[in-house]
From Swiss-Prot:
PTM section of the record: The phosphoenolpyruvate-dependent sugar phosphotransferase system (PTS), including enzyme I, and histidine-containing protein (HPr) are required for the phosphorylation, which leads to the activation of the enzyme.
Protein name: Glycerol kinase
Binding-site positions, ADP: T14, R18, T268, G311, G412, N416
Pathway, per record: Polyol metabolism; glycerol degradation via glycerol kinase pathway; sn-glycerol 3-phosphate from glycerol: step 1/1
Protein source organism: Limosilactobacillus reuteri (strain DSM 20016) (Lactobacillus reuteri)
Phosphohistidine modification, residue list: H232
Annotated positions binding glycerol: R84, E85, Y136, D246, Q247
Family classification: Belongs to the FGGY kinase family.
Length: 500
């Protein structure tokens, strides 16, 4: 493979779109980023304009090509990674969306999800899709749009409409409106996809009255989906060859290819994903079963746990309690405090995610005394992020019976050395921090590169996915166990208070 060639990754996130060009050594050559508007038509509703998303993607592609000075024919392939679950329905003839994109965290379809639970479909949907019934996933969003947009049901019945998660919407536009497809990771987040048969599930489609003609073709994560349209890249047809949802792309970018490998992406919340190998593991403890990636004719599965509040707890200390001016200051203040002074912070501002799934519980502080200082509360808040991670990781180990050997980490809060050391101590496991921040985009690039033989195999990719720092446990195991017991008491007390 000529060393003159490159891979482009499109990373379409919840608040911004990015295009990144990588070379053959997995180095970042150029990056462009652009934010786009968020819409909140009613409390709890979150929407995007799909045309604004597409405009932002075209803009970052153009900018990154200008920045890098790379000719289009030198781009060997394009990979796409995306905010998952966000739902677009558009007219296949005009290419125009019939409604805004309903974003993953939007609550406007909660009533549909609650009705499905009341009607007794919880076990059936969990068995088939690996997911819990929730408005988070695409299924209820599709039904809502079909039910609420005038004429949508009639158009859908005639086969005039197309559904896609954001990857599908971008692929359709990027391919000159020729390819309507998605990958197995994104399909597995719709609550319509049977993770055992690897096909759309007719029983669930019938239940929600969703015509199959609406749905994209499902392909492996690493495959040539199609080629760029004539009006992009000066007419050079570049293969679009890799697609994965953002958390799965981060797993792939961190080379977590072995069964039992776990990664944690610390963002506003935190997403912990464990590669469980070639067979799905259904969790008895509130974790989601999902698809990690599809590659070389094989489907790899994963368990996922979401923590609602991670980095946003630090923002709360900064913006809500005015404890410091910059989030980065929290690290030194936590170190200077030396201990939490017996304080535990449960940052359940919007309830608790995995493995508790408790919507009623609210944030709380325990162990306050007259001697409690600002530093104690800051340190306890950072420690809470590590405790929540342990809650999920321990559940994964319990569900799979696989040993925990290390946790690879990326995302903003992973740059906090104090927190990463405490994470290693409380898990009693080494923490490996990614050298590159853009591991999600790198994962999409890896998937695309494999499909066009830019890279040979996963062994080559392991060498390119570099670890920056490793944090080994330094705390006495008994002390770590005692601290964690205190956390479990704090959670139980917060849940008790949240009950009517």
């Amino acid at each position: 493979m000529s060393e003159q060639q490159y891979i482009m990754a499109i990373d379409q996130g919840t608040t911004s779109s990015r295009a990144i060009i990588f070379d053959h050594d997995g180095n970042k050559v150029a990056i462009s980023q652009q934010e786009f508007p968020q819409y909140f038509p009613q409390p709890g509703w979150v929407e995007h304009d799909p045309l604004e998303i597409w405009d932002s993607v075209q803009s970052v592609i153009s900018n990154v090509m200008i920045k890098s000075q790379i000719k289009p024919y030198k781009i060997a392939a394009i990979g796409i990674t995306n905010q998952r679950e966000t739902t677009v329905i558009w007219d296949r003839h005009t290419g125009k969306p019939i409604y805004n994109a309903i974003v993953w965290q939007s609550k406007q379809t909660s009533d549909i999800a609650e009705q499905l639970i009341k009607d007794g479909y919880k076990d059936m949907i969990h068995q088939k899709t690996g997911l819990v019934i929730d408005s988070y996933f695409a299924a209820t969003k599709i039904k809502w749009i079909l039910d609420h947009v005038p004429g949508a049901r009639e158009k859908a019945a005639k086969g005039d409409l197309m559904f896609g998660t954001i990857d599908t919407w971008l692929l359709w536009n990027l391919s000159g409106r020729r390819v309507h497809a998605t990958d197995v990771t994104n399909a597995s987040r719709t609550m319509l996809f049977n993770i055992h048969t690897l096909d759309w599930d007719q029983d669930i489609l019938d239940l929600l009255d969703i015509p199959q003609s609406l749905l994209p073709v499902v392909k492996p994560s690493s495959a040539i989906y199609g080629y760029t349209g004539d009006y992009h890249f000066y007419g050079v047809q570049i293969p679009i060859a890799g697609i994965a949802g953002d958390q799965q792309a981060a797993l792939f970018g961190q080379a977590a290819y072995d069964k039992g490998s776990i990664k944690n992406t610390y963002g506003t919340g935190a997403f912990i994903v464990m590669n469980t190998g070639l067979k799905p593991t259904l969790s008895d403890n509130g974790l989601l079963t999902t698809i990690a990636y599809g590659l070389d004719g094989q489907t790899h599965y994963a368990l996922e746990g979401s923590i609602f509040v991670a980095g946003s707890a630090v923002q709360w200390l900064r913006d809500g309690l005015k404890m410091f001016d910059k989030a980065s200051e929290s690290e030194q203040m936590a170190v200077d405090a030396k201990t939490t002074g017996g304080v535990y912070v449960v940052p359940a501002f919007t309830g608790l995610g995995a493995p508790y799934w408790d919507q009623e519980v609210r944030g709380a502080m325990f162990g306050l005394t007259r001697g409690t200082e600002r530093g104690h509360i800051i340190r306890a808040t950072l420690e809470a992020i590590a405790y929540q991670t342990k809650d999920v990781v321990d559940t994964m180990v319990k569900d799979t019976q696989l040993p925990l050997t290390a946790l690879t980490v990326n995302g903003g809060a992973s740059r906090n050395n104090f927190m990463m050391q405490f994470q290693a101590d409380i898990l009693q496991t080494p923490i490996k921090r990614a050298a590159m921040e853009e591991t999600t985009a790198l994962g999409a690039a890896f998937l695309a590169g494999l499909a066009v033989d830019f890279w040979e195999d996963q062994d080559e990719l392991r060498k390119l996915s570099r670890i920056g720092d490793q944090f080994d446990p330094q705390m006495d195991p008994q002390k770590a166990a005692d601290l964690y017991r205190g956390w479990q008491r704090a959670i139980a007390a917060a849940q008790f208070y949240g009950k009517d």
